[in-house]
Curated annotation (Swiss-Prot):
[4Fe-4S] cluster binds at C166, C169, C172, C233. Transmembrane segments: none annotated. Binds 1 [2Fe-2S] cluster. Binds 1 [3Fe-4S] cluster. It comes from the Eukaryota. [3Fe-4S] cluster binds at C176, C223, C229. Residues 156-186 form the 4Fe-4S ferredoxin-type domain. GO terms for cellular component: mitochondrial inner membrane. A ubiquinone binds at W181. [2Fe-2S] cluster binds at C74, C79, C82, C94. The gene is SDH2. Iron-sulfur protein (IP) subunit of succinate dehydrogenase (SDH) that is involved in complex II of the mitochondrial electron transport chain and is responsible for transferring electrons from succinate to ubiquinone (coenzyme Q). This is Succinate dehydrogenase [ubiquinone] iron-sulfur subunit, mitochondrial. It comes from Candida glabrata (strain ATCC 2001 / BCRC 20586 / JCM 3761 / NBRC 0622 / NRRL Y-65 / CBS 138). Keywords: 2Fe-2S, 3Fe-4S, 4Fe-4S, Electron transport, Iron, Iron-sulfur, Membrane, Metal-binding, Mitochondrion, Mitochondrion inner membrane, Oxidoreductase, Transit peptide, Transport, Tricarboxylic acid cycle.
Length: 253
């Protein structure tokens, strides 16, 4: 019986019709400065590939072109490494399902309006420097005398829901036109949402300094409520609302 099942499975695999899906992927190699950026076409058999775009990218890299370069790590939407522009939208390749229509070509680009290291790898140095600039850590002038942790109420803890889940993938910031044109000074949706996360943390005692840092014409107020950030967030968060809440706080300063 076991041999019969194995033979039937093997026959089904051998006779299955390939379902070839076309992917056009952005390619650029800094080691070849005379070669312009271009889209390179690959075909992947959907019958022999996982359901996510990252599965297709790994299959291409492992079986067709080892030079294809992209970031990836957890494959579970936790690390944010595989953020890229897929089919015109910023998202995570590990969470983006492959369009099963073989007649449609899927185009994959790096996150838009960023310097590119190679292929699908954006340079996030500036993005991380902006994140560092908001001092994203607990700041206090005094601590409990007994040396224990600083506690907060259940209600205060709930205020952080929808904020701390950000994985800093930069999908939202790189979908924002204001960030495209002003990223040297405008902090962008992702960083501002984290700024708000620390502004409303009941345990933090640097609220005044944090507000002062944001009270200028560029760091915060380049947001024009386009809301691309909220639409594209792969974690379902709402950076636009966080920015609006910061503006409300600063209006009373």
């Amino acid at each position: 019986m076991f041999m019969l099942r194995v033979s039937r499975r093997g026959l089904a695999t051998a006779t299955s019709v390939p379902r070839l899906k076309t992917f056009k992927i952005y390619r650029w190699n800094p080691d070849k400065p005379t070669e312009k950026p271009h889209l390179q076409e690959y075909k992947v058999d959907l019958e022999d590939c996982g359901p996510m775009v990252l599965d297709a990218l790994l299959k291409i890299k492992n079986e067709q072109d080892a030079t294809l370069t992209f970031r990836r790590s957890c494959r579970e939407g936790i690390c944010g490494s595989c953020a890229m522009n897929i089919g015109g939208a910023n998202t995570l390749a590990c969470l983006c399902k492959i369009d099963q229509d073989e007649s449609k070509t899927t185009k994959i680009y790096p996150l838009p309006h960023m310097f590119i290291v190679k292929d699908l790898v954006p340079d996030l140095t500036g993005f991380y420097q902006q994140y560092k600039s908001i001092q994203p850590y607990l700041q206090r002038t005094d601590y409990p005398a007994d040396g224990k942790e600083v506690l907060q109420s259940i209600d205060d803890r709930k205020k952080l829901d929808g904020l701390y889940e950000c994985i800093l993938c930069a999908c939202c910031s790189t979908s924002c036109p204001s960030y495209w044109w002003n990223q040297e000074e405008y902090l962008g949706p992702a960083v501002l949402m984290q700024a708000y996360r620390w502004l409303i943390d009941s345990r933090d005692q640097a609220t005044k300094a944090r507000r002062t840092m944001l009270q200028n014409s560029m760091s915060l107020y380049r947001c024009h409520t386009i809301m691309n950030c909220t639409r594209t967030c792969p974690k379902g968060l709402n950076p636009g609302r966080s920015i609006a809440e910061i503006k409300k706080q600063l209006a009373f300063d």
